């Protein structure tokens, strides 16, 4: 028996001492458990439910005997037939099965896992079932909101990490690491909602009056001809706007343009061209790899529309692949365009003035929500504890929630959809009905469709205050416009742009989104694994009007920037090796007689978790 037990424990990644194996064999014989696999499975479920995945030891085997084995024996003794139980119920397809999930369930139903469902005399003496814990986030170690079903014991997962991210954390939880807003507004806020108020949520990124959902999604049909057409649409929308901003209609009429006036290569006023930036190798740009595709409906299709760009004369520039620009310069010979000026700004449609009549409290947090070495989701539990104490009006969560590249994803013994449902259920249970919860999943999520823009996954259970949003999203919250994405477009832009004397990098990356009118203006995408769909992007990723606040999660350092009177926030990552962070901000109602502006109306902080 000991050898069989040792083999089963080995398969679970557990190496108990010989004395412990002897005690396990003794317990198995005493309680008529003749199958080593059954004994080990019962121990693993008990360990993960009560001991946070500890390995078996002489001390905790005593608890196991009292709470599981003895209880099972008592139950069997009170059966109407008087016969000993030889089966403890078949595994259920529900999440409550101990064989399907070694996790903590809502009511911790150990009896349901180990004892058959036959009737039991209510007057029998037995160990009472533990009461449901009311404060599930008060003690992280003692009460998990949800636990992943796994083929590998949690203790083995914990040992797999040689160093936990917290070992290199700078600062302590609760530290404020970034701030924006009027000092009086910051000092006067308790960062708690003052009254219960239902915040209406209305999606504004629509096509044919409908947001992006799985029901109206048609993808994997992005033909090359369609991509070319969609790029031309972007060109035709942005190019004239750049010309109008810089030159105006009258000024544009006086300029010499390429390719219409391509015969006039030398001119006193310079040559102008509107085109789309590309890279020779589809990678990051540099001073020698950029070329510009110039399109014009009046020029024959046979003409080569590309110009190689030379930046030796330029004083300031910031370009990236897929960007539509207005360039000024000359062509000394061949197809080389000597750039003297490059213009990328157009007239922007400003955000709708703030129209709220009461203070709104927001919390914004971005995934990943668990460390890279385990699936315990401890940073998420810490965040939920903060939310339970502060009760904001709106909570914005962006993915990834279950990163498909996480090293432990392959150990899950349940579907990704089921795991995500459990996670959302735990979040909603902890937060309650007071807070409106906006969830924006990522195409990096294992349970999400791998396409950008990304529709929200469908949930079997609905909650009145839960809003599953696509990536990207633009929503109206009681007169306040919020833009949000889970895609790291800031990092993608900065890693692929070519910049010369272009100013502060975060500011210019944000401006790229505004002036290109897109949540993701790069083409081709910076991430090779990103399944970019140009047709969906044309319908559901345009940024035609500035929001009041824009959420741009990024692996770049957390930041708060005011750009074109839009407050842009990178809250950082909840789980980060250098210490997780999240953002909180409040929007105050306008004071009668005073002009509303973001500095006086919005206060924001990034806080360490």
Curated annotation (Swiss-Prot):
Disulfide linkage: none
Superkingdom as given in the UniProt entry: Eukaryota
Subunit structure: Component of the alpha DNA polymerase complex (also known as the alpha DNA polymerase-primase complex) consisting of four subunits: the catalytic subunit PolA1, the regulatory subunit PolA2, and the primase complex subunits Prim1 and Prim2 respectively. PolA1 associates with the DNA primase complex before association with PolA2.
Gene Ontology annotations of biological process type: DNA replication initiation; DNA-templated DNA replication
One GO cellular component, as annotated: alpha DNA polymerase:primase complex
Subcellular location: Nucleus
Protein name according to UniProt: DNA polymerase alpha subunit B
Major location (coarse): nucleus
Residues carrying Phosphoserine: 155, 166, 168
Name of encoding gene: PolA2
Task performed by this protein: Accessory subunit of the DNA polymerase alpha complex (also known as the alpha DNA polymerase-primase complex) which plays an essential role in the initiation of DNA synthesis. During the S phase of the cell cycle, the DNA polymerase alpha complex (composed of a catalytic subunit PolA1, an accessory subunit PolA2 and two primase subunits, the catalytic subunit Prim1 and the regulatory subunit Prim2) is recruited to DNA at the replicative forks. The primase subunit of the polymerase alpha complex initiates DNA synthesis by oligomerising short RNA primers on both leading and lagging strands.
Organism: Drosophila melanogaster (Fruit fly)
